[in-house]
Regions:
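Short, strongly hydrophobic alpha-helical membrane anchors
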Residues: 1-4
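Single-pass alpha-helical transmembrane signal-anchor segments
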Residues: 7-24
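Residue-level detector of alpha-helix boundaries and kinks
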Residues: 21-25, 184-187
């Protein structure tokens, strides 16, 4: 004799599955975002900077710093694909959304010109026109600028310094605040420290 289907039991089972995903996923995501944030704080401290504020959530961290060379103040926002909601996580994977680190900074001596370098294989290429008019291709980067003449020597210096890094999506210098924009992958803490070290030397 076949038992009749019980819709209420099915709803309970689905609810239990989603709740389990939420609990396990939230814990794993919190640990991941805390690990990334702590590694950034440690890297900044080792380079001579200081953390002024830090907030950690399930899928994001917001950090504020000061005193990293000529970078008077800067903030770092890290966002990851949370595992707490299985549907959202699957959708983010299908859409090829990547974990992202965004840095915005105030430089004591603002840049004399504005330009942006976007890695040709990065997700940031989809929005390249937001950063100005296409100017040139330099190695693996596309140069965009809202000005007619980008500082060629400094641009080449930046490209040369960033060449070893494969986590960088975009770096932008501006005469207006924020003077510095950086988009990068937060996946490898040691490379984030290298990126911060390079930026400290460049500015």
């Amino acid at each position: 004799m076949n038992e009749s289907f019980d819709p209420a039991a099915a709803v309970v089972i689905v609810a239990i599955i989603f709740f389990s995903f939420y609990v396990v996923g939230s814990t794993a995501s919190r640990k991941k975002i805390a690990k990334i944030g702590s590694s950034i704080q440690q890297a900044v401290a080792e380079l001579g900077g200081k953390t002024t504020a830090a907030r950690f959530g399930v899928s994001a961290a917001v950090l504020s710093f000061k005193g990293l060379g000529n970078m008077e103040q800067f903030s770092v926002v890290v966002g990851i694909s949370s595992w707490a909601n299985p549907l959202s996580y699957v959708i983010s994977r299908v859409m090829k959304k990547k974990d992202l680190l965004i840095l915005r900074g105030k430089i004591s001596k603002p840049p004399s010109s504005s330009f942006t370098l976007i890695h040709k294989d990065s997700p940031a290429m989809r929005y390249a026109d937001r950063w100005g008019t296409f100017v040139d291709r330099i190695d693996s980067y596309v140069l965009c600028s809202v000005e007619e003449n980008a500082p060629k020597n400094f641009v080449e210096q930046v490209v040369s310094a960033l060449r070893p890094l494969d986590i960088l999506y975009l770096v932008s210098f501006s005469k207006e605040l924020p003077h510095l924009h950086v988009y990068a992958s937060p996946s490898e803490p040691e490379k984030i420290k290298t990126l911060l070290s390079i930026l400290k030397k460049l500015i």
